[in-house]
């Protein structure tokens, strides 16, 4: 199943790249505007392949517990402000409304790998974008204080997930509605990577969803305290 998924997900952008490259070589793209459009499409499809290869490389490290974490003290407010600003630019271009609420004190810290937590957020948001099917789409991000932890909530109003699929969405290679996933791409390991990263941070991740209404992903990470174990620094 994995090999079949990878073959399909690589073949789709490769076919597009070849087609548009041939269009340029054969003179079908006979205006500067067409050439620009073709080159941009080739670039975007190459990016899709690069993301898939990076995901598979990370998966191989996960499979052997070799993720290279770089833990550091992170200010929650500053960090998530930066993440949301970056996400917002991409969502704006896709005409998806983004809202953000931070209910955590400005001095709260966590011990985390900033690159890997950013990967978690980007994977979840990217998944939401894939399955948007409404004219007025939105993604809401909320950061809440829940005692010894911060809780991150990422809500969308996309297609949602069938309740029969919910117990398996974080399993490796699992694809809810395989035909739909084949159309949108993806290796089926994105959420399993997210789960592994959060658990390696001592946290927990879960989701709620209603088919037709959307999905909310939740994850928690423990706050930094002076007395906590600092072995990960």
Model regions: which residues?
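Short conserved segment of the HATPase_c
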Residues: 161-175
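Short alpha-helical segment of the dimerization/phosphotransfer core of two-component systems
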Residues: 44-49
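Short helix-loop "hinge" at the ATP-lid/N-box region of the Bergerat-fold HATPase_c
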Residues: 128-129
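Conserved micro-motifs of the catalytic ATP-binding
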Residues: 64-69, 109-112
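Acidic ATP/Mg2+-coordinating residue in the GHKL
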Residues: 156
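A conserved beta-strand-to-alpha-helix junction within the catalytic ATP-binding
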Residues: 70-88
